[in-house]
Structures are given as structure tokens and as C-alpha cells.
Amino acid sequence: MKISKFAEVNTVSVDTIRHYIDLGLIIPEKKGGHYFFDEYCQKDMELILEYKRLGFSLNEIKDLFLYKNLGKSIDYEKNTFY
């Protein structure tokens, strides 16, 4: 879905979505200068909103996402190479 619909579905502004993209919290596909958001973006957005509801700052959320993605990378390496 496009950025305006993604923002509407998640009841946040388009500027907020762009800010999350700039921080690397959401990584949508980009085609011809337009962002497209899939189910992975939606899951990440739901996590962001939940962490914010719990009182985490965006920097803390960014760190949590880093650890989450690092864990996936380590699992991939274990499954691939060992």
C-alpha cells in the first residue's frame, strides 16, 4: 500500500511514517520515487506503536529493532552454515 494509506491505517501522519523511514525503523520498497508498504512494514509498525505505548523512546525502539534483526541474522547463519 502507499504511504498515505499506510499512515491512515495506523492512525499516524505521513510525516511520522517518513520520520520512521529516516530512522530505519520501517524499510518499505521504493518504486519510481514512491514507497510501498507490505505486511512486514505493518508488523514493524505495530511493534513501534506498542513500544511507544509502553513508553520507549524512538532511540530505544531503534536499538530493540537492531537486536531483533541481529537475532534473525544469527539464526540464519546457524541454519545455513552449521
Question: Where is each model-derived feature located?
Answer:
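Glycine-centered, phosphate/nucleic-acid-interacting loop/turn motifs that mediate DNA/RNA or nucleotide
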Residues: 24
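Conserved active-site tyrosine of GNAT-family acetyltransferases
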Residues: 20, 37
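Short glycine/proline-centered loop/turn elements that form peptide/ligand docking sites
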Residues: 6, 13-16
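Arg/Lys-rich, alpha-helical DNA-contact motif
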Residues: 2-8, 27, 39-82
